[in-house]
A protein has these predicted regions:
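Bacterial Sec-dependent N-terminal signal peptides
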Residues: 1-28
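Extracytoplasmic/secretory-pathway proteins
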Residues: 25-31, 35-253
Length: 253
């Protein structure tokens, strides 16, 4: 009888732990929202750092990803140069993680950051002579446009490398980092649609820069990458029987 009672208590405790953890994260994020409304960036940074460390301890990737990106945003608001250290942190994370899905998401984030930086600094990049066949400097402020474009393309390739995994992984599993949109419902909220869409957006942000580099009549590799992503998505959704996803992708293409 005692053994049965102990077993029941253990099972109940195991069921309670995840709920308590979720409540704790929710409480912390509510504090973040309050700090944000009060325009307290240092408090937001402190709280998101706490969430990140808690997520790391509990191996909760969605919480870690959301906390890291929020902390990164507010650190950059206070000190723009923090972007470089935080980007290196993401690149170190992607090397160390043993979770394929986390790795894909991190590559997608990194690609987006490089694309945003290049797009925001187009004028300066256009003044520089392209450097090819040379390892980029440690400081990306010294890079040329082609180096950023290559970083974006390489990280996107890694992000979408395992399309089978992305198709069978629901973005629901990455809440609260992922916010479910209405359109993603037509794709059954799979991670393939999410990361492919992010990849296309990142490539589009550097497409104009790439046009400048390839104005000698050669085909723009960035444009080719965009076409290739759509070209892979259409048959993938057709094969899985997602009619709505297939039609929407074909229309966007």
């Amino acid at each position: 009888m005692k053994v049965k009672q102990i077993c029941m208590m253990v099972l109940l405790w195991l069921g309670v732990i995840p709920a308590v953890q979720a409540q704790t994260f929710d409480k912390l994020w509510k504090e973040v929202e309050q700090a944000e409304k009060k325009s307290l960036p240092k408090t937001v940074i402190k709280l998101t750092d706490e969430i990140y460390q808690k997520g790391e301890k509990e191996k909760n990737s969605p919480q870690m990803l959301k906390a890291y990106t929020w902390r990164m945003k507010y650190r950059e608001m206070l000190n723009p140069d923090s972007l470089y250290a935080d980007l290196k942190g993401l690149e170190q994370w992607v090397k160390q993680t043993d979770q394929p899905m986390d790795r894909a998401i991190l590559h997608s984030l990194i690609a987006g950051i490089y694309a945003d930086y290049a797009a925001s600094n187009q004028w300066q990049l256009r003044q520089r002579t392209e450097i090819v066949d040379q390892t980029p400097a440690t400081d990306m402020r010294e890079w040329t446009a082609n180096m950023f474009i290559e970083k974006v393309r390489t990280n996107i390739k890694e992000a979408l490398a395992d399309s089978v995994l992305l198709l069978k992984t629901s973005s629901r599993g990455y809440i609260p980092f992922v916010e479910l949109g209405e359109t993603s419902e037509y794709y059954h909220h799979d991670m393939y649609h999410l990361l492919a869409s992010r990849s296309i957006e990142a490539l589009q942000r550097v497409e104009e820069l790439s046009n400048r580099i390839t104005n000698d009549g050669t085909v723009n590799p960035v444009k080719q990458d965009i076409i290739a992503i759509y070209g892979n998505m259409i048959p993938a959704y057709k094969a899985t029987g997602l009619k709505e996803g297939y039609v929407l992708t074909a229309l966007n293409y």
